[in-house]
């Protein structure tokens, strides 16, 4: 029996129209364009600022584009998985809302929460479902409305984040392409350094939590930066060595777009030139679970069948990991 691989067959993306520039940020908090560009690498970010729109709105836009590009029949979709830290509601899942918006009748749907590592977990989960032989066509979506949890009076966090979504079609194949390997790790000791203090079952919403601004993202930036550089660099080098990849045969590195200095550190560890590294943080900021697929969306035209791609990310938990993908189609023809 031939081995079943899971291959990405298409990419769709969406970012909101509203552009929040560094100049606007500098009018909200004590900062400036030079500091933000030097310390973070973000020039502007997109914000979903229309009343009553949430993560599923962006996810639908991205997934709809994906289905059109891949000429997919809604009845053929077996599953929809959404990675998000900012769901529309605590329940039902954003994925179930997305199923309805896409008119999918035969799919099962669920969310997963791995913060900025969400897309790595999506690829691993979809690959496992495909490998079971019971599922052939799965939509995976990384989507986050980070503006919904950012305090725009906090100069340490508000310049970093933006909103966006991107979706990939993952299908079964017997060809030697697709999601080839992954290394995923969790260090639960990261809780104190990156979290939202209230809103869950430990500290439910109340007048007190709202008054004390406990529903915003909290981050100890220096600690997170140190862990991110170390773990992303190490795990990326490990998966490369494990699969016989090096600076000569790695075609693209796709790092989580959290900070340009972290991206530089990962590229340096692999000795890969920045020309081989997908970077769009300057335009979108950190969109959490959407950063990796948004990179694919931006760079799709440059991808060639057989390209070796290494994805790597680090997020709250702490979660971190790397995924090796052998690209399955010529992006210039899409």
Curated annotation (Swiss-Prot):
One example GO MF annotation: beta-ketoacyl-acyl-carrier-protein synthase III activity
Subunit-level organization: Homodimer.
InterPro entries: ACP_syn_III_C, ACP_syn_III_N, FabH, Thiolase-like
Sequence segments annotated as region (ACP-binding): 257-261
Any single GO CC term annotated in Swiss-Prot or TrEMBL for this entry: cytoplasm
Gene source species: Phocaeicola vulgatus (strain ATCC 8482 / DSM 1447 / JCM 5826 / CCUG 4940 / NBRC 14291 / NCTC 11154)
Designated gene of the protein: fabH
Pfam families: ACP_syn_III, ACP_syn_III_C
Protein name as annotated: Beta-ketoacyl-[acyl-carrier-protein] synthase III
Compartments, as annotated in UniProt: Cytoplasm
Claim: Acyltransferase is one of the keywords in the record: yes
Signal peptide: none
Gene Ontology biological-process annotations: fatty acid biosynthetic process; secondary metabolite biosynthetic process
Membership in a protein family: Belongs to the thiolase-like superfamily. FabH family.
